Swiss-Prot record:
Species lineage: Viruses, Adnaviria, Zilligvirae, Taleaviricota, Tokiviricetes
InterPro entries, alphabetized: BrxL-like (IPR014061)
Protein name: Uncharacterized protein ORF426
Pfam families: BrxL_ATPase (PF13337)
């Protein structure tokens, strides 16, 4: 057994994000009826409300969804809708530690009193399984497989044969680049519209459960997204490490237009603003945005045979954007908005779930360590020099730096440019 095979065998567990009970092993919690009840109480608002009508106390396994700070302390809102006000020092010793904890799970003990439900304690889950991830570890990995292949495998994908590394690079790696930052510190927003059954939703649900992302298939309200003027509570752009919008091919209407207006500025400038009744709330935070959707009928045909690689790449990219603007004007209203995305991948022949997925995922704490160590590799690389102009130049610089840090063998600007506007059609 190789080093990589042995490591993945020792530090992964079977996880189905559509069944939160399977998360218990990853959190180092025994799979008991009490633990299953606790994770349901922490994620299902209705179940929690009814349970407390029959019981005086409960333990929840849950996550922080929103928080708001004022002179009286910190108001936390958990996944099941329960809110509590406390000092942030109860959770963490420093402000950096507090923000690092936002992507973790917590055990929350509650009791009923004459007023309502009282939170007695909030403690982060401390997994029993852990291992050091450092530069020496990465060197052992890349002696056997490219780092990007190992990263993908850590999210429950099979390690492919060397002959199909390029399939993982071109079709699948794009789902992960938003986890990293280039030197510019600009988030790498991505969009993928691909055939059903490719495992993309499963991958991003893992990011929801392990890495503090917010996932939704419905357009959120602006109060929930940015700021609620009634509750004075900041939205998910202030508390989540990224936002995943799924099933976007079906989105339309006034709410979508309002959201896109806010996203357009937030994705570019890391400034999220909401104005209500003469008052305005602005949140300055850089987070990646992900658009996911299903696409089975796209067709991109050349008007004439391209004469060289550069022309081929430029024409394919231009045609891809033209198709998206014409076919999905509700979610991609302008070319300027498309330019916000570091990677757009569209196609109907992405590898299927059964071809690529094992369902064996790295333990959450180890996965987070791996991402942090890979970021250090990326930080040592330089932006990819290129002769493009405007946002395209910046995109190739940023994505090229991240890809190089992950061990990807795309060393020419035109190849990176093509990767950022990928078309996979039969």
């Amino acid at each position: 057994m190789t080093f990589v095979e042995d490591f993945l065998s020792s530090y992964t567990f079977s996880y189905n994000p559509r069944n939160l009970e399977t998360l218990l092993l990853g959190l180092g919690i025994k799979d008991t009826e009490g633990a299953k009840r606790a994770i349901r109480l922490g994620s299902d608002p209705k179940y929690f409300q009814v349970y407390m009508m029959y019981n005086d106390k409960a333990k929840l396994i849950t996550r922080i969804m929103q928080f708001n700070a004022d002179k009286y302390g910190m108001k936390l809102t958990f996944q099941n809708g329960l809110s509590v006000k406390l000092s942030p020092k109860v959770l963490a010793e420093s402000v950096d530690d507090f923000f690092d904890m936002l992507d973790q799970w917590f055990i929350v003990s509650v009791e009923k009193d004459e007023i309502g439900v009282l939170v007695k304690s909030v403690k982060p889950v401390k997994p029993k399984t852990d291992v050091d991830i450092d530069e020496d570890f990465l060197k052992k990995v890349e002696a056997e497989v490219p780092l990007y292949i190992f990263l993908i495998a850590s999210f429950g994908y099979k390690i492919p044969d060397k002959t199909t590394y390029n399939v993982y690079r071109d079709y699948i790696l794009g789902r992960f680049i938003h986890l990293f930052r280039p030197s510019s510190n600009i988030p790498l927003h991505i969009a993928e519209l691909s055939n059903r059954g490719t495992g993309k939703t499963t991958t991003f649900l893992i990011m929801r459960d392990f890495l503090g992302y917010y996932y939704t298939t419905e357009p959120p309200t602006l109060p929930f997204l940015v700021y609620d003027s009634k509750t004075k509570q900041q939205g998910i752009v202030a508390t989540k490490n990224g936002i995943i919008f799924d099933e976007v091919q079906d989105w339309s209407g006034d709410r979508v237009k309002a959201i896109l207006s806010v996203l357009d500025t937030g994705m570019e400038n890391c400034t999220w603003n909401r104005s209500v009744s003469g008052s305005s709330e602005t949140i300055n935070r850089c987070i990646p945005i992900v658009f996911l959707g299903n696409e089975n009928y796209i067709s991109i045909d050349f008007y004439q045979a391209p004469s060289n690689l550069q022309q081929y790449i430029a024409e394919k990219s231009s045609m891809l954007e033209e198709v998206l603007l014409n076919k999905y004007p509700d979610i991609f209203p302008t070319k300027a908005f498309l330019d916000r995305f570091a990677r757009i991948a569209v196609g109907n022949n992405f590898p299927s779930f059964t071809e690529t997925i094992t369902g064996k995922v790295l333990f959450p704490t180890i996965l987070r360590k791996l991402i942090r160590e890979l970021q250090k590799r990326i930080d040592r690389e330089s932006p990819l020099n290129n002769d493009y102009e405007g946002r395209t130049r910046r995109r190739v610089e940023d994505v090229g730096q991240v890809l190089k840090g992950l061990g990807v063998d795309l060393d020419k600007p035109e190849l990176v440019y093509a990767w950022t506007r990928f078309v996979g059609v039969q």
